[in-house]
Amino acid sequence: MTNLRKELEKCKHPNSRKTKALGKKARRQNNKHKVRLGHAIKSNITGEKLSWFLGQIDEGRTEPLRPQELEDLIELYFTRFDEELEQINLKQSIGKHRANQHAARKDVITMTLEKERNEFRTGGLELMNLCDPLKLKMLRDWDGSALSVQHLKLDLVSYNMLQRLKEQSKKKETSEQMET
């Protein structure tokens, strides 16, 4: 970027072809940087989400989660900000006369939770299907870095998908009981 700035300073006329080409080159580099930054932010958010789920699963557990356990874990994930929201509400109740001090943080939390709940109920949260033994093993082997998140195969885990998995597991259990 500094080389571009130096070259722009050398240009004599602001409407010359060289000046326009350098401006175009600068905009292109800026746009590339924005795209890279967007990918980095997304992988950081996904990495934090996966590390939260990994931290909630028992260390010694080798068998995959049952669909009901995964649904309970997702519901627990939705309550991860409850303590912080309680603290904000407590601070607001103490000083009624002051302006809402933590309104921005509270709004971000509520919007995030609303978006995630809506995703879970409709299309699905971008997560690893922890009901699959191979994906659970991949999550266990993950080093926790945001750079390696892109190598993990993520699924869209939705409420409807978990209901289908529950029905399949019930059918499987009943067929096994019929055989014995």
UniProtKB/Swiss-Prot annotation:
InterPro entries: Tma16, Tma16_sf. One of its GO terms (cellular component) is nucleus. Residues 13-32 have a biased composition (Basic residues). It comes from the Eukaryota. Residues 1-12 have a biased composition (Basic and acidic residues). Disulfide bonds: none annotated. Residues 1-32 are annotated as: Disordered. Belongs to the TMA16 family. This is Translation machinery-associated protein 16 homolog. It comes from Drosophila melanogaster (Fruit fly).
